[in-house]
Amino acid sequence: MTVFGRVKDLQAIVAALVAEDPKPSVLATLVSVSGSSYRRPGARLLIAADKERTGSISGGCLEEDVMARAARVSATGQADAVVYDTTSENDLVWGVGLGCHGIVRVLLEKLPPRPPWATVLAENFARRRRTALAILHGGDSTQSWGTRLAAPGDCADPDALFLETISPPTALTIFGAGDDAQPLVRLAKELGWYVTIADPRGAFATASRFPMADAIVTGPADHLVARIAPGPDTLAVVMTHHYVHDLPLLRALLDRPLAYLGLLGPRKRADKLCDDLRTAGLTLSAEQRAQLHAPVGLDLGADGPEQVALAIVAEMQAVLTGRNARPLRERDLPIHD
């Protein structure tokens, strides 16, 4: 299983684990799900000795019971695996009707200070590399249960071993540092994405205007894309509001295999940009034109920067997960299938 959406929780958990003076902690990992569940396998909850919590494994209905079990795991040092069955319509096992209609298995393990897998994961996040983890949660000896770096030959076993590949945070590059880019940065950071602001205008692309951005790049419009070198895992949106900037940016971006390319503005403006690119000698294929999300965003009736940012991020999320962005009530399959 490859992990994208849980990276924000993981970033916070890893930061706590590799801190200079880490707190004694127990890690709860959701290792398997049968049926419906609020969270999917790989969701984690870190419980420190002072009961500080980082992350989540449910919508809030399992955490109290897990914390009680974590106290026992912390005291004994022995890992534990617990199964929560929420398939009953009258499920009141923990004092609430969970109503998730699923069976989930959670592993609880006491962690040593700065566990090696967390150190490697922190390094790979910084270097934007993937990390393969193996979580053993079954077998005769609980002494070997827990999280480690995956090794060659590891094979997933739903009854004993959960394997996951953790991708680095989703990379979003916003070409344009206008005021409407600010809520887009904030919303993307709420999702744990790595956000780069790029703009030819150095007076706009500043740390004071974009304190949450991970990187800020300035320079001539026809050099910006080459300097950033966005790859196939990068989301990109062009929103400088200046035709003279958008044209060279779009020309450079259309030649790259991006995960997503969006252009702010009406369809007529996008068509004119594409026509001008053809006039300038760019061979624009039907596939390249179809790759361009213009106008950018979902049709949410957005009005104002915050709503436009929501529409843009929602479309990007749908593209990342291969979904059609239709209402869930119109979906015949289970939500997570």
Question: Which residues are covered by each model-predicted region?
Answer:
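Segments forming oxygen-rich coordination pockets for charged ligands
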Residues: M1-D214, G231-L235, D276, G281, ...
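Short beta->alpha junction loops/turns
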Residues: G59, A177, H242-Y243, P266, ...
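Thr-Gly-centered strand-to-loop micro-motif
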Residues: T170, F175, V238-T240, L263-L264, ...
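A generic structural signal for alpha->beta connector loops
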Residues: G192, A213-D214, P257-L258, A286-R289
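ADP-ribose/adenylate-binding Rossmann-like module
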Residues: A198-D199, L235-D246, R251-D276
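Short acidic-hydrophobic, aromatic-tinged amphipathic segments that line or gate anion-handling sites
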Residues: A215-P220
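Short amphipathic alpha-helix with an adjacent loop that forms part of the alpha/beta core around
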Residues: D222-G231
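Adenosine-phosphate binding glycine-rich loop
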Residues: L263-D337
